Amino acid sequence: MSRLPVLLLLQLLVRPGLQAPMTQTTSLKTSWVNCSNMIDEIITHLKQPPLPLLDFNNLNGEDQDILMENNLRRPNLEAFNRAVKSLQNASAIESILKNLLPCLPLATAAPTRHPIRIKDGDWNEFRRKLTFYLKTLENAQAQQTTLSLAIF
């Protein structure tokens, strides 16, 4: 007996077009929950000892602007993905950061400045900037979800 008919049947069953349709609000809620969980997990890792005596919210205005700029969300994530490789014991954060890309909206225009700079191997700077970036993403996602749900 040939396996081809069975494979074709399986392909038809898992094809997105034949599955129950997902409403836009359902997909927004689901994706937001996944993104929110990833953000929370990264923040949990960032809060683990050894904690420095620095204030994590103390970023200069330029860094804050760069981390909040919508068109730099993806380039900033790429910068964090590069920087995490130079840190010790950050493999858990690295694996979550790789999965965070689908949570980011596409840029509406080309960035007008360079993405965030993070010193290689500087755990404190990485932690401070990534925490601010994730809080910014979380706030933006919450606003977008609220607006989208209000429309429906």
Curated annotation (Swiss-Prot):
SS bond partners: 35-103
Keywords, in A-Z order: Cytokine, Disulfide bond, Glycoprotein, Growth factor, Secreted, Signal
Keyword Ligase attached: no
One GO BP annotation of this record: interleukin-3-mediated signaling pathway
Gene3D superfamilies: 1.20.1250.10
One GO CC annotation: extracellular space
Residues listed as glycosylation sites in the UniProt record: 34, 89
Protein task: Granulocyte/macrophage colony-stimulating factors are cytokines that act in hematopoiesis by controlling the production, differentiation, and function of 2 related white cell populations of the blood, the granulocytes and the monocytes-macrophages.
Name the record gives this protein: Interleukin-3
Organism: Pan troglodytes
